[in-house]
Design a protein with these regions (language model features):
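Repeat-blade elements of multi-bladed beta-propeller folds
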Residues: 43-47, 95-115, 138-164, 191-213, ...
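Mature N-terminal segment immediately following signal peptide/propeptide cleavage
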Residues: 31-82, 102-106, 362
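Short, polar loop/linker segments at the starts of domains and inter-domain junctions
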Residues: 53-65, 83-96, 247-250
């Protein structure tokens, strides 16, 4: 692509390619980021590399010339806009369905899911190389994965469609019958995002309902060559697992939630560790029937990518009552401290905290303190007495509010600000006892309250 480079934007139902005109591109390395792709002009994974950096080393598009980008082609990801709206609920080509995918580019070919199909395109022109129409449950809106083959089996495009894991021949777009049963594997529990490819292993998560009981949210792995199931990691600690004692009164039984739902996974290719960001146990906002810290909910768990064997865990919230699980897998990087290189990861949570851990051991690098937090007045609830606060870095988002933070005369007029404060008080006022303020109890006979702020 001498003399030009494309920026690809996927927005809703349209894929747009932008072109910048300039001189030859200068390609640079990715420094100390682990597992950089061999072809820097490709975008082979959801976040570019297995470390989840989202960083491209290409230098042709810059802050100086980005304003000169011109649209050169578009591709409609939702071809059948006249389809009935009922089909938009995850099946077929519904008029209300869309694609929220990050396209991947491997060996100069772009792959992505549309609505009800998976396509391969020429990045320079948007021309279709092949399309595969998906019947039944629609393909994941988040993206697809590429497995390079093994000399016997050809390269494959692998994606989730409901509870099915499907493999296509990357060159032809046809079902690869050597994978599973005629190109499909029944995952049993659905997964709506992008499988992780590590060597000949495919790792998938789980999307489970929000009810307290139901299907497990376990991460699972399948053989990329045959589709055979390799391992399953219990996201709710079972008898004999580390952390099983964090579920009181057998509350681990038939417990849903704590699922591995992220759009993608990150893996330390050198150490063979995949990092599972696990969600809150169900139910999200009441834990009276699950007293204890509830491992491995709200945790990052490192497991052996080949075997699924537990290596370590770090829990960001004990006994979550706020649905403040990690919104994404950790990013992997190396840092130098006291003259020593440390393999690190950074995990964010919906509480606004970032935890920087040694990705080999799970130990905090800059310290974590267990601090007392507010109690709960909800009958039957037993909020955990402490929560882990990172010493560094400081919160990356506001995690508590005071009444004066909601509106002030500087935001509007004094009269309007006073009217807003009166309206807030009329509806119960503001309850805030700092980070991890619990939900207040209101009997059915009591007036409505509260405007809760945390």
């Amino acid at each position: 692509m001498c003399g030009k480079w494309f920026a690809i934007l996927a927005t809703g139902a349209i894929l747009t390619a932008l072109l910048v005109q300039s001189g030859g591109a200068q390609q640079q390395g990715t420094g100390k980021q682990p597992a950089a792709p061999k072809q820097s002009s490709d975008w082979p994974l959801y976040r570019h590399d297995s470390a989840g950096t989202g960083y491209s080393p290409l230098t042709q598009i810059t802050t100086e010339n980005v304003a000169n980008l011109k649209q050169v082609w578009t591709y409609r990801l939702q071809p059948d806009v006249s389809a009935p709206a009922a089909a938009a609920k995850g099946k077929g080509k519904g008029g209300g369905a869309n694609s929220e995918a990050t396209p991947i580019v491997v060996n100069g070919v772009m792959y992505l899911p549309g609505v009800g199909r998976v396509v391969a395109l020429e990045p320079e022109t948007g021309k279709e190389i092949w399309t595969y129409e998906v019947t039944g449950a629609a393909p994941s809106r988040r993206g697809v994965a590429y497995w390079p083959g093994d000399g016997i089996n050809p390269p494959r495009i692998v994606f989730a469609a409901g509870r099915r894991l499907i493999a296509l021949n990357a060159n032809s777009g046809k079902i690869d019958p050597g994978f599973g049963k005629e190109g499909e594997v029944d995952m049993v529990v659905p997964y709506n995002s992008v499988p992780l490819v590590y060597r000949n292993v495919l790792v998938v998560g789980a999307n489970t309902p929000a009810g307290p009981s139901g299907a497990p949210g376990n991460a699972r792995a399948f053989d990329a060559r045959t589709g055979a199931k390799l391992w399953e990691f219990n996201s709710v600690a079972q008898p004999g697992d580390v952390g099983h004692d964090t579920w009181e009164a057998d509350s681990w039984k038939n417990r849903s939630g704590a699922n591995a739902w992220p759009f993608y996974f990150t893996v330390d290719e050198q150490r063979g560790l995949v990092y599972l960001p696990l969600a809150s146990p169900a139910s999200d906002f009441y834990g009276g029937d699950r007293k204890g810290a509830n491992l491995y909910g709200n945790s990052v768990v490192a497991v052996d990518a080949l075997t699924g064997k537990y290596r370590w865990h770090f829990q960001t919230i004990h006994h979550d009552l706020w649905d403040h699980d990690p919104p994404a897998p950790p990013a992997l990087f190396d840092i130098t401290r006291n003259g020593r290189s440390i393999p690190a990861l950074a995990l964010t949570t919906k509480s606004g905290y970032m935890y920087i851990l040694n990705r080999e051991t799970g130990e905090p690098i800059f310290g974590v303190e267990e601090r007392p937090v507010p109690k709960s007045d909800v009958p039957g609830e037993q909020a955990y007495p402490t929560q882990p606060f990172p010493v560094k870095p400081p919160p990356i988002a506001r995690n508590s509010f005071k009444p004066e933070d909601l509106v002030s005369a500087q935001d509007t007029t004094p009269e309007h600000a006073q009217a807003c404060r009166e309206l807030i008080e009329k509806n119960g006022g503001v309850t805030n006892a700092g980070p991890f303020t619990t939900w207040p109890y209101r009997p059915d006979s009591a007036p409505a309250k509260t405007t809760r702020s945390r």
